[in-house]
Amino acid sequence: MFSLQGYDAFLGFLLISAAVPVLALVTNKLLSPKSQTGERELTYESGMEPIGGAWIQFNIRYYMFALVFVIFDVETVFLYPWAVAFHKLGLLAFIEALIFIAILIVALAYAWRKGALEWS
């Protein structure tokens, strides 16, 4: 029959990892001050009175630049283990990595052509 004997540690870890955030939220709710003043709802700006509103619209160029950064950051995450194990992987892994890099170069050229890297 099926035995759960080997999963005792995992079950304990699961229960503790679920109980700690719940306990933190309940403790915060019980110990936090209950008053809502107008000053408490103000935006905090480095200890000074806020200047202007906190809700401003960012230019889309910042989002495009961040998206390109994330794409090439993920590229680094994939290529680093490949570079570490390069000698053990063989020719097929080398060709696959070249195809992966070629696809990313095409993506960079596309982003460059569309102006995602321009700040002017």
Swiss-Prot record:
Subcellular location: Cellular thylakoid membrane
Transmembrane residue ranges: 6-26, 64-84, 89-109
Catalytic activity: a plastoquinone + NADH + (n+1) H(+)(in) = a plastoquinol + NAD(+) + n H(+)(out); a plastoquinone + NADPH + (n+1) H(+)(in) = a plastoquinol + NADP(+) + n H(+)(out)
Signal sequence range: none
Enzyme Commission code(s) on record: 7.1.1.-
Protein name in the entry: NAD(P)H-quinone oxidoreductase subunit 3
Keywords from the named record: Membrane, NAD, NADP, Plastoquinone, Quinone, Thylakoid, Translocase, Transmembrane, Transmembrane helix, Transport
Protein family: Belongs to the complex I subunit 3 family.
Cited Gene3D superfamilies: NADH:ubiquinone/plastoquinone oxidoreductase, chain 3
Molecular functions per Gene Ontology: NADH dehydrogenase (ubiquinone) activity; quinone binding
This protein's record includes keyword Transmembrane: yes
Class in the EC hierarchy, top level: translocase
Membrane topology reported for the UniProt record: Multi-pass membrane protein
Lineage: Bacteria, Bacillati, Cyanobacteriota, Cyanophyceae, Synechococcales
Record text on subunit structure and interactions: NDH-1 can be composed of about 15 different subunits; different subcomplexes with different compositions have been identified which probably have different functions.
Source organism (scientific name): Prochlorococcus marinus (strain MIT 9211)
HAMAP family the UniProt entry points to: NDH1_NuoA
Function noted in UniProt: NDH-1 shuttles electrons from an unknown electron donor, via FMN and iron-sulfur (Fe-S) centers, to quinones in the respiratory and/or the photosynthetic chain. The immediate electron acceptor for the enzyme in this species is believed to be plastoquinone. Couples the redox reaction to proton translocation, and thus conserves the redox energy in a proton gradient. Cyanobacterial NDH-1 also plays a role in inorganic carbon-concentration.
Any one biological process term the GO annotation gives: photosynthesis, light reaction
GO cellular component: NADH dehydrogenase complex; plasma membrane-derived thylakoid membrane
